[in-house]
Amino acid sequence: TAITGREKMENLNITNLQRAEIITQALPYIQKYHNKIIVVKYGGNAMISEELKLQVMEDLVLLWLIGVKPVLVHGGGPEISDMLKKVGKQSEFVDGLRVTDKETAEIVQMVLAGKINKQLVNLLGEFGGNAVGISGIDGHLIEAKVKDERLGFVGEITNVNVQPILDLIEKEYIPVVST
């Protein structure tokens, strides 16, 4: 189980005066970002460390609890590569981008929306957050055009339909978007 922020503070053996100082220093930022939407891009390589993952999720819930409206947008490169290996599919990269045929696109979708997204939503819930996971293809959330024919299904974003995200935020959810 994860250590809560309160337990971390207790383990630090800091005085109440020091705690008050920390909160006082944070107050201008809390006021500045209260009721503001922030987008956090959480990349696949940052997800490798379980400890870092837990800290990021806890921090997002803290932001949400103090009135900031986070939107978590995540990838999952390393887990995608692992799954492709498991099914015997070789990853090929051109200029740092994965060549993505139809079969690879289906595996990517399965890993991002079916596995990683659900794990992150669950972790946010364990820390007291209220999160909903969606995929970039849900409700035409993200529209794209093919970036380079050599890359297959890899695209460049042409439009983001933000309304589904705004609807979730209005209902006090933390949107978790797989891309």
Where does each model-flagged region fall?
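Nucleotide/pyrophosphate-binding catalytic subdomain
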Residues: 1-179
